């Protein structure tokens, strides 16, 4: 593997304009802001970034802009959310010559799902044809992979190097940590980052990190330093923010939280609605509790 990404890895929001196009010049300000907060890596094109709405050209351009903005300061992970092995491979090939540390790949996520052998074959073909490290993004409710199946895939396909575990059940997370001790296990259980870290998570890739990167890095650092009193305090404040942003329009609520902390205002891609006035009020209050409202604006380079 080119690099083993660990620590706090925020999944970026994609900066859409009102006409639905990506405003690529606003990628760099977000990358710089997240790195400035102490983030250890960057993920683009995932669910927080509405990667499922991007066509192949947009996907390639977004990844290129993210890699260019990162300038090698932190590893970049490329999300892939598509419905077929063919399209997943195509996206992987679009970015394999960029400075991408790994692919973050969801299982196919339409109403029906492949059986276990077909799922193993899906990730095997991706690995064989892209030659890139793969992190399974275990998030799709109707195509959810058990710890046993995840472990089987990682054992049979060496380029599958880890899992981003996104269920709220810490028992599943703990089982996976125990069954795959030599693999990279990331938490995407936004409400439970603190216990995930104490269980030994290698890092996190979750929307809460993009909504409050400074506090999220502080939580990681506190657990690593053994300062559990401070970690618990941060956990409670971050949980209040998570409760404010978690909703069907989570990407919009995440980008609204970012805008309150200085990033340029951007939009979700239609038909996803923006944060409602009620959501905005609760998000603002939670960020105030974190001391995250600085009023400093982040400007895009011309």
Identify the residue ranges that each predicted region occupies.
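C-terminal alpha-helical cap/extension of soluble enzyme domains
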Residues: 4, 9-13, 37-39, 198-201, ...
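Short helix-capping segments at alpha-helix termini
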Residues: 68-74, 98-99, 129-132, 155-159, ...
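A general structural signal for well-ordered alpha-helical segments in protein cores
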Residues: 9, 27, 59, 63, ...
């Amino acid at each position: 593997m080119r690099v083993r990404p660990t620590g706090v890895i925020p999944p970026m929001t994609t900066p859409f304009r009102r006409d639905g196009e990506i405003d690529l010049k606003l990628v760099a300000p977000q990358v710089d802001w997240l790195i400035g907060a102490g983030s250890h890596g960057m993920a683009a094109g995932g669910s927080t970034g509405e990667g499922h709405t991007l066509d192949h050209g947009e996907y390639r351009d977004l990844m290129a802009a993210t890699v260019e903005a990162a300038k090698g300061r932190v590893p970049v992970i490329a999300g892939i959310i598509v419905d077929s092995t063919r399209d997943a491979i195509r996206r992987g090939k679009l970015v394999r010559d960029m400075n991408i540390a790994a692919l973050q790949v969801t299982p196919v996520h339409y109403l029906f799902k492949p059986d276990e052998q077909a799922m193993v074959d899906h990730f095997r073909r991706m690995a064989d044809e892209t030659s890139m490290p793969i992190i399974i993004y275990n998030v799709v409710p109707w195509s959810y992979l058990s710890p046993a199946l995840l472990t089987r895939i990682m054992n049979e396909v060496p380029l599958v190097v880890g899992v981003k575990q996104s269920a709220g059940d810490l028992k599943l997370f703990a089982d996976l940590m125990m069954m795959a001790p030599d693999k990279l296990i990331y938490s995407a259980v936004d409400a439970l980052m603190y216990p995930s870290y104490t269980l030994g998570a290698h890092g996190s890739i979750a929307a809460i990190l993009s909504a409050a990167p400074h506090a999220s890095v502080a939580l990681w650092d506190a657990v690593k330093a053994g300062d559990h009193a401070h970690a618990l305090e941060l956990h409670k404040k971050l949980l209040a923010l998570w409760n404010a942003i978690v909703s069907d329009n989570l990407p919009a609520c995440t980008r609204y939280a970012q805008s309150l902390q200085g990033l340029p205002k951007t939009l979700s891609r239609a038909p996803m609605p923006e944060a409602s006035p009620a959501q905005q009020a609760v998000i603002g209050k939670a960020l105030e509790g974190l001391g995250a409202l600085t009023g400093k604006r982040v400007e895009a380079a011309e």
